[in-house]
């Protein structure tokens, strides 16, 4: 059985690119979210094996969404996606409970390496 993934990013092109990379590698993308609040709701509905989370999103940012998801499921596996220059936010996300991060723009191989590491 393939691992299930929830992809959360406010930019549709990023959600599509990440979903394509994961699907081609055999992962099952079970849902998408464009805000942190939506990410929390979809997490409750879908219980995915992994959440790919953008840091900067409208309504509720990725870091607050990580905190909410960790309250629901302390062992949730969350991989942050951040733009260059957001190191302080990445540290905050890891402290909130995220397992790892990748920096945009990224190579598909880097995405898959990080996903495998987080799911181990």
Where would I find each of the regions flagged by the language model?
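C-terminal output helix
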Residues: 88, 106-115
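Receiver (REC) domain active-site loop signature in two-component systems and cognate sites
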Residues: 57
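Acidic catalytic/metal-coordinating carboxylates
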Residues: 35-38, 60-64
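Active-site beta3 strand of CheY-like receiver
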Residues: 46-52
């Amino acid at each position: 059985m393939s691992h299930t993934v929830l992809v959360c990013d406010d930019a549709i092109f990023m959600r599509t690119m990440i979903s394509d990379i994961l699907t081609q590698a055999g992962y099952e993308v079970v849902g998408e979210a464009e805000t942190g609040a939506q990410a929390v709701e979809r997490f409750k509905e879908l219980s995915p094996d992994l959440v790919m989370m953008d840091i900067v999103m409208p309504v509720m940012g990725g870091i607050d969404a990580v905190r909410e998801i960790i309250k629901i499921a302390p062992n949730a596996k969350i991989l942050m996606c951040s733009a260059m220059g957001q190191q302080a936010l990445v540290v905050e996300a890891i402290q909130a409970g995220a397992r790892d991060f990748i920096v945009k723009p990224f190579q598909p191989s880097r995405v898959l390496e990080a996903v495998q590491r987080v799911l181990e």
